[in-house]
A protein has these predicted regions:
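Beta-strand elements of well-folded, non-transmembrane domains
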Residues: 557-561, 573-579, 590-592
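Extended low-complexity, serine/threonine- and proline-enriched intrinsically disordered segments
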Residues: 72-87, 578-621, 683-695
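Extracellular beta-strand-rich, repetitive "passenger/adhesive" scaffolds
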Residues: 163-499
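Short, well-ordered beta-strand segments enriched in hydrophobic/aromatic residues
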Residues: 63, 555, 566-575
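Bacterial N-terminal signal peptides that target proteins for export
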Residues: 1-10
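Acidic/polar, low-complexity intrinsically disordered N-terminal segments immediately downstream
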Residues: 24-201, 490-542
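A eukaryote-biased signal for long
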Residues: 621-780
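C-terminal motif of bacterial Sec signal peptides marking the signal peptidase cleavage site
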Residues: 19-22
């Protein structure tokens, strides 16, 4: 311990006056508890320490994980402290278990107290990761990985599309064939809604009827037609484009209010470039199987179809389908092929329902229009009010836009939505509760306010994201992908790397044209074990200089798990900021020595054995005295670095200390007779340091939660311990990271500005070690 600090020197004089320095030798004749309390309070860098704080920065969490998957497949379940899939990931594994279909796992693991979310991964036989971010609530994590309806490796198109309305064909082929026989052939320039006494119409019986049936003549018909409403007494006008007829619309033909245009199998409407077929109010179209509307012109529906449904079971292939104006919305039901350069809809309530194929350069619906896709849809820009993806459907777009609030998406089981460019997730995307949906996105659009919004992806949706750029610690700095994994994925939603989704959608050439099956290449995920740092002050039970670098250990921990019989700990002696002999040991609470088959050592074994000749610890693989498992790590910190005799420089603590180029590492291997759960770092791993004073037993310095001596050691006297308890000082810290410890003589509060705040209230600022307030720390 360094004795050149004024506070420490003052303390030593005071302590001498009350014979405190000899208290560990049971010489307490002048002990004064009040004066000792004052000394502790004056020398420790933080006043008014949290009386209920135990100085722990980690906690034990229990995970409950339901695993579903394919029968006969063995899965790995791994829990990480961060996103394991990011190319820049530093995620550390916290727990690992094996599982099969239907397994419910319960496993306890340790993590930083500051950690509020973990990433639970299911890894299949191809080493594909399905990852679910899960919030830690009340010390527990609950996750569901995989989906209960998956039992085989094959999947066929479902019969039902429960969320997509269906429509029976309005006519049979026989009905239209019969009707056209009696229908009146139209002539150029007719107003099909004319009254029975109007001009030349008076001699034609059809104009006396309430429901009037007309047909386009055979061959090519180029002349204009129109209807102008109900003033002529007609209630409905039906125009059949029969087989063998081609209706050429070369300008604009407008049909007001009461017209249905029916294209029979083999009938054709061609709309020329710059020409428009205009349907207003209760006018609408019906395209039978085999019928077609083609050309470079426009179909324009305005002021709604008044409750009538437009129906296409043939082919519509034109430039623009435009729907605008007032009314309650246009219903357009597609059972055939709809090919467009552009679909533009702005009439509130308009719904485009697809049970066939839709291909468009742009689909641009405002935020009061809807798309319901039960089959195949492909577009460039994709914008709408709401979207429903039906059971076993596929939609592909280049850009998934956003045009206002409530642009929500519902995805049913076996549906797949793919965006090859940027996709806005400024919305709620709701997946199935039974079965799985796949959301494939190249890049999530970076929209202002996304992180603060209530947007989410929820239920059984797998998100396959290509751009996994992760930025930002605070929510207001999150990149879109950081938002997704930290907040956006909810209620069982998961994510994976491209091509790795546990999802099968076979292409059938009809509704599923591209389909999906995962590749067999493994995910490239580096497994990093958690490293905890143990930082000690050696002058216990006297006050120290509180730079917490007298001994600094980095300990690599095994992942938590159940039923293990082998434990491995890798211990790095990172710093020795003391000039006296110090040793270190590990007591594992919960392991009785009778259950130990063997304790062995890998790297560092020779230095360890030779250092134990100092006598602080037994020179054995574990100590024989007592029932607890106590493993000596080294008996002389300087010796393992090659310093003997009186050579005891400060090592690797900055300032004038001696730097270390090679860190001493000791591998500790423990074999047990009977399986146990991995011991908790918070409640079970008691790393401590010790020195030999004037007493027969060594003096030990433990973390506060392990503040009891081993069989071969001692703490301070009872009276001193009572004062320490009242003041609640500490001489040891366990930091759940590679701790950048203070340099020589730098008080910890000068290195970490939030340390004092945490000490005052240890329920706050539990991540203080992430905020370095000076350059007086040792980073590595």
């Amino acid at each position: 311990m360094k004795q050149n600090i004024a506070k420490v020197f003052t303390f030593s004089l005071l302590a001498s006056s009350i014979s405190f320095i000899s208290c560990v030798d049971n010489e307490k004749n002048l002990f004064d508890a009040d004066q000792l309390k004052q000394i502790y309070e004056e020398t420790f860098p933080v006043k008014n320490i949290d009386p209920d704080g135990d100085w722990t920065l980690s906690r034990s969490v229990t995970a409950h994980i339901l695993v579903n998957g394919y029968e006969g497949v063995n899965y790995k379940i791994r829990i990480f402290d961060a996103d394991p899939l990011s190319s820049e990931s530093t995620a550390k594994i916290l727990a690992e278990e094996d599982a099969t279909q239907g397994t419910t796992l319960t496993v306890a693991f340790d993590c930083a107290t500051a950690l509020n979310k973990v990433f639970v991964a299911r890894i299949d036989e191809h080493k594909h990761y399905m990852v679910q971010p899960v919030v830690i609530e009340n010390g527990e994590v609950t996750a569901h990985l995989g989906y209960t309806d998956v039992s085989t490796r094959s999947m066929s198109r479902a019969v039902t599309t429960t969320g997509i309305p269906t429509m029976k064909a309005p006519y049979t082929a026989d009905f239209i064939s019969a009707k056209k026989e009696d229908a009146t052939p139209v002539e150029a320039g007719w107003d099909l809604s004319a009254g029975p006494g109007w001009f030349e119409y008076a001699k034609l019986p059809v104009f006396k009827e309430k429901i009037r049936w007309f047909k386009i003549p055979s061959g090519i018909f180029k002349a204009g037609l129109k209807t102008s409403g109900t003033s002529g007494g007609a209630e409905a006008i039906k125009i059949i484009v029969p087989q063998g007829s081609t209706w050429m619309i070369e300008n604009s033909n407008q049909f007001d209010n009461i017209t249905e245009i029916i294209v029979e199998n083999g009938g054709i409407i061609k709309i020329a470039e710059n020409a428009t077929l205009i349907l207003t109010q209760a006018s609408y179209i019906t395209v039978m199987p085999g019928g077609s509307i083609m050309g470079k012109g426009t179909i324009y529906m305005t002021n709604s179809s008044a409750g009538f449904t437009n129906y296409n079971a043939g082919i519509i292939d034109c430039d623009l389908l435009k729907i605008d104006g007032g009314g309650s919305g246009v219903d357009f039901m597609n059972y055939g092929t709809l090919k467009l350069n552009s679909y533009r809809a702005s009439t509130a309530g308009t719904t485009l329902t697809n049970h066939g194929t839709i291909e468009a350069v742009t689909i641009d619906g405002n935020n009061n229009t809807h798309i319901k896709n039960g089959c195949y849809l492909k577009t460039g820009k994709f914008q709408f009010g709401t979207l429903v993806m039906g059971n076993t459907s596929e939609a592909i777009c280049e850009e998934l836009g956003y045009n206002g609030n409530d642009n929500d998406i519902v995805m049913e089981a076996q549906s797949m939505l793919t965006c090859t460019g940027k996709a806005s997730l400024y919305r709620t995307v709701t997946g199935p509760t039974v079965g799985t949906a796949l959301l494939r996105i190249n890049e999530i659009a970076n929209l202002s306010g996304l992180a603060q919004s209530n947007s989410k992806v929820t239920n059984n949706i797998i998100c396959e994201i290509t751009d996994q750029t992760y930025k930002g610690e605070a929510h207001y700095d999150w990149s879109p992908f950081a938002w997704l994994v930290n907040k956006g994925l909810q209620q069982g939603a998961t994510y994976c790397n491209p091509g790795k989704a546990d999802f099968i959608l076979p292409a059938d050439g009809e509704c599923i044209k591209e389909g999906y099956n995962s590749d067999e290449n493994p995910d490239d995920v580096e497994i990093r074990n958690a490293v905890y740092s143990y930082a000690f002050e050696d002058n216990y039970p006297q006050a120290g200089d509180y730079d917490f670098n007298d001994i600094v250990l980095n300990v690599k921990l095994p992942a938590a798990g159940n039923d293990v019989k082998e434990l491995k700990y890798t211990v790095d002696l990172r710093a020795v900021g003391a000039v006296k002999q110090l040793g270190a040991g590990l007591r594992i609470q919960g392991i009785d020595k009778s259950n130990v088959e063997e304790v062995s050592f890998g790297a560092g074994a020779t230095q360890r054995t030779n250092s134990l000749n100092s006598g602080i610890f037994e020179n054995a693989s574990y100590e024989t005295n007592g029932n607890e498992l106590v493993i000596p790590l080294f008996g002389d910190a300087h010796y393992v670095y090659g310093y003997t005799g009186s050579q005891r420089p400060m090592l690797n603590t900055g300032n004038a200390s001696t730097p270390l180029t090679d860190i001493y590492t000791l591998e500790v291997n423990i074999k047990l007779k009977n399986a146990i759960s991995i011991p908790s770092v918070t409640d079970g791993l008691d790393f401590f340091i010790a020195y030999q004073g004037g007493a027969q037993k060594r003096t030990e310095i433990h973390l506060n939660q392990f503040n009891s001596a081993t069989a071969n050691g001692q703490l301070a006297d009872k009276e001193v311990l009572e004062v320490i308890k009242a003041v609640n000082n500490t001489w040891a810290l366990c930091v759940p990271e590679k701790f950048a410890y203070p340099t020589e003589t730098t008080v910890i509060t000068n290195a970490y500005s939030k340390f004092a705040d945490w000490a005052h209230d240890q329920s706050t600022n539990t991540d203080w070690y992430n905020t370095v307030s000076s350059n007086k720390v040792m980073k590595y």
